[in-house]
Amino acid sequence: MKDNLKIMDLPKNERPRERLFRYGSEALSNSELLAVILGTGIKGENIVSLSNRIIKDNGGLNGIFNSDLEDFVSISGVGKAKAAKILAMAELSKRFKSYKDGDDYRICSPQDAAVLVMEEMRGMKQEHLKVILLNTKNMVIGIKNVFIGTLNSSIVHPREIFFYAIKKNSASIILCHNHPSGDPSPSNEDVNVTFRLKKCGELLGIQLVDHLIIGNGIFISLKEKGIL
């Protein structure tokens, strides 16, 4: 006999799946949507209650999207199978939010670039540096994660940045890095790294178009600030 409580064990009018069929997915709470994905609860706790606890223990949806396997399996009742479902759902959501007609995406403003990386980078617990590669028409031809750690001009080497740009025959690049604090205000080191990479790009004939600093749902463009 199985001890796991399933959605079907709930009263019919409380079953998330039945409510979704009847009222549409938009009528379900976050816990109910997660319950539909996970399917079964645990001994003594139905899936809606477990889902609600998972969301709360991770600090809400933003925490869900930025937690890892270790974070999830540390929650009572969440094994690797359930954690894998949540991680897959979160990753698919991130990719969908950044999807812009595949390769046919033109960067016309800092906002256009920020859309591509915001959902992935806004809640990262470490600093990540990404480079968006553009062709002569400002179309995106690639996005590469080139560095993890605190941005420092003595550590961030132009070789890693421009290796991918040269390999992809990029005409220009946009740098993007996050501040785990959520505050995108540029530090002196951010500015120093930017100037150094700009000079290197000029020597190589690859323009550094902008450097975006990503915070929690907000960003700063060094170009718009007149720094670049």
From Swiss-Prot:
Q: What is this protein called?
A: UPF0758 protein CKL_0865
Pfam families referenced in this protein's UniProt entry, alphabetically: RadC (PF04002), UPF0758_N (PF20582)
Q: Name one GO molecular function term.
A: metallopeptidase activity
Source organism per entry reads Clostridium kluyveri (strain ATCC 8527 / DSM 555 / NBRC 12016 / NCIMB 10680 / K1)
Does Metal-binding show up as a keyword for this record? yes
GO biological process annotation, one example: proteolysis
Q: Which PROSITE patterns match?
A: MPN, UPF0758
Q: Which residues form the MPN domain?
A: 106-228
Concerning PANTHER family, the annotation shows: DNA REPAIR PROTEIN RADC, UPF0758 PROTEIN YEES-RELATED
Which sites bind Zn(2+)?
177, 179, 190
Concerning its family, UniProt says: Belongs to the UPF0758 family.
Any idea which UniProt keywords this protein has? Answer: Hydrolase, Metal-binding, Metalloprotease, Protease, Zinc
> Residue numbers of motif JAMM motif?
177-190
- Give disulfide pairs as residue numbers: none
